[in-house]
């Protein structure tokens, strides 16, 4: 096991090193803060959709439509959201901050970090389960938490309106469309014309380093702006959510997946391992931007994301070692 964990550390070091490079570049202003939205836009609208299209097109359609994966992941996401909202709400933390704390606990950084990292560790067979988790979290988990965040201000009517706006935002996001087009290409065994395929391949190859560098830059920007706006969030409001994300969430996914298999759900071992490793990823960096947009305590959210990203450098290889053992 120690040798295996060391080997996994050696695989993951370049991924986290790119995140650290982006953080240092933004923190030192070598990368101007004003340039980060443009870098993020390149990853979100060009490089990452091309990478996801290629994974979708090269993954058997049966893996992309695996209901067992969706059921296990969805149940764990809902349980995590419910638990974090329940224990977070108090006289200082209302629905808005509790909902975004729940989102940052249940939503791993699957798109920017998980796809390249897990395919490097598990191979291309991990792409199907990972893509399913991306779709579920982007469409349902995010929309649910945004709806819950509005309960403070406008009750159930405001929550329903917020959910509709969140779903409209999903439709404007190119990532689900790239996955859908890739799935259709897989189902139809369609191959793109040579020049188009090479162009998409070049953009897709740029996705991994650009996305990881962008994570670090976004974390640095969010931390700096949030600290200027509200000061530093107290540890008691940050650490429990970090522990949920990196410890409770993977354990919950492992337990639910094991129970699902025990009750006869056709969940393969590779898919189960992929789900546990997705849950062990740090929090999604884009939650910070959502929290800022909806007026939540972005200082707290940014700190949770930063802590999970730093801690995952040590915790993630351990989870991989246990899951692969």
Feature-to-residue mapping (PLM):
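Alpha-helical transmembrane segments of multi-pass small-molecule/ion transporters
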Residues: 1-325
């Amino acid at each position: 096991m120690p040798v295996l964990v060391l080997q996994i550390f050696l695989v993951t070091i370049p991924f986290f090193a790119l995140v650290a490079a982006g953080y240092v570049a933004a923190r030192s202003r070598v990368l101007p803060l004003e340039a980060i939205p443009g870098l993020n836009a390149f990853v979100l609208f060009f490089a990452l959709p091309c990478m996801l299209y290629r994974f979708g097109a090269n993954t058997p359609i049966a893996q992309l439509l695996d209901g067992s994966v969706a059921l296990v992941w969805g149940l764990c996401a809902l349980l995590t959201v419910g638990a974090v909202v329940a224990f977070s709400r108090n006289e200082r933390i209302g629905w808005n901050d509790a909902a975004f704390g729940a989102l940052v606990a249940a939503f791993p950084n699957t798109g920017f970090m998980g796809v390249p990292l897990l395919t490097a560790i598990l191979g291309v067979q991990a792409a199907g389960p990972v893509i399913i988790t991306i779709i579920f979290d982007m469409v349902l988990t995010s929309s649910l938490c945004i709806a819950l965040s509005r309960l403070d201000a406008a009750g159930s009517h405001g929550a329903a309106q917020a959910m509709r706006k969140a779903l409209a935002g999903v439709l404007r996001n190119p990532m689900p469309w790239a996955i859908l087009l890739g799935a259709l290409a897989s189902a139809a065994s369609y191959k793109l014309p040579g020049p188009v395929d090479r162009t998409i391949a070049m953009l897709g190859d740029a996705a991994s380093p650009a996305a990881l560098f962008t994570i670090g830059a976004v974390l640095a920007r969010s931390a700096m702006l949030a600290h200027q706006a509200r000061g530093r969030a107290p540890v008691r409001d940050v650490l429990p959510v970090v522990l949920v994300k990196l410890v409770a969430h993977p354990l919950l996914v492992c337990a639910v997946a094991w129970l699902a298999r025990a009750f006869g759900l056709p969940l393969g071992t590779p898919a189960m391992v992929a789900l546990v490793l997705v849950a062990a990823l740090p929090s999604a960096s884009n939650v910070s931007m959502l929290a800022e947009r909806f007026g939540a305590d972005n200082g707290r959210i940014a700190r949770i994301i930063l802590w999970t990203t730093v801690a995952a450098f040590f915790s993630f290889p351990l989870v991989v070692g246990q899951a692969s053992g």
